[in-house]
Amino acid sequence: MKWGINMLNREIINALLDIKAVELRVDKENWFTWASGIKSPIYCDNRLTMSYPKIRKQIAEGFVKKINELYPNVDYIVGTATAGIPHAAWISDIMDLPMLYVRGSAKDHGKTNQIEGKFEKGKKVVVIEDLISTGKSSVLAAQALQEEGLEVLGVIAIFSYNLNKAKEKFDEAKIPFSTLTNYDVLLELAKETGLIGDKENQILIDWRNNL
């Protein structure tokens, strides 16, 4: 996976920093704890973007551009529950495509569906995520779609921490993935703007490289 830097990468990181969707804590005693149990100096809450029309539109247009470049033959846009659902809705509206969403697991009531929406087996889908950390939940969502007979062209997220274990999970599952922006761009801009210095930058690089 080549983590490219372009203007869209930078614009989205700037927007996430402006609305405090990304928070950095270089003091190890104050690090965040992810749901996976990983201790982290960074927390990215892309759900906040829903509350900012200009930013969510910019993100949706970024998704559409990437989908058109990578997967122009897509049939359905699929959001992951819950944070990927609104972005999938905005994307599918712009592209005039059907939308589905996929849960982390099947319901234990009603029709016990894991995938919601009407679909035909054999159709091509792109999965929309707000965030890729370890890649586990994204891969499980994509595999659930494959098990129902859908062809997963790839997973696209707003942001990735660029963790090696995420790349390994996607490679093992043979599922392509890409993002609108990523951890490397975040560190570059944080340093440029004085949000972090050389010492803090190295702490953040070492944390990522050691996972």
Curated annotation (Swiss-Prot):
GO molecular function, one term: orotate phosphoribosyltransferase activity
Reactions mediated catalytically: orotidine 5'-phosphate + diphosphate = orotate + 5-phospho-alpha-D-ribose 1-diphosphate
Binding site residues for 5-phospho-alpha-D-ribose 1-diphosphate: 103, 107, 109, 129-137
Binding-site residues for orotate, renumbered to this chain: 133
Pfam (any one): Pribosyltran
Cofactor: Mg(2+)
Keywords, alphabetical: Glycosyltransferase, Magnesium, Pyrimidine biosynthesis, Transferase
CDD domains: PRTases_typeI
EC numbers for this chain: 2.4.2.10
Pathway of action: Pyrimidine metabolism; UMP biosynthesis via de novo pathway; UMP from orotate: step 1/2
InterPro entries documented for this protein: OPRT (IPR023031), Or_phspho_trans_dom (IPR004467), PRibTrfase_dom (IPR000836), PRTase-like (IPR029057)
Gene Ontology biological process terms in this record: 'de novo' UMP biosynthetic process; pyrimidine nucleobase biosynthetic process; UMP biosynthetic process
Assembly, per entry: Homodimer.
NCBIfam families given in the database record: pyrE (TIGR00336)
PANTHER family: OROTATE PHOSPHORIBOSYLTRANSFERASE, URIDINE 5'-MONOPHOSPHATE SYNTHASE
Assigned protein family: Belongs to the purine/pyrimidine phosphoribosyltransferase family. PyrE subfamily.
HAMAP family the UniProt entry points to: PyrE
Function: Catalyzes the transfer of a ribosyl phosphate group from 5-phosphoribose 1-diphosphate to orotate, leading to the formation of orotidine monophosphate (OMP).
Protein name as annotated: Orotate phosphoribosyltransferase
Lineage of producing organism: Bacteria, Fusobacteriati, Fusobacteriota, Fusobacteriia, Fusobacteriales
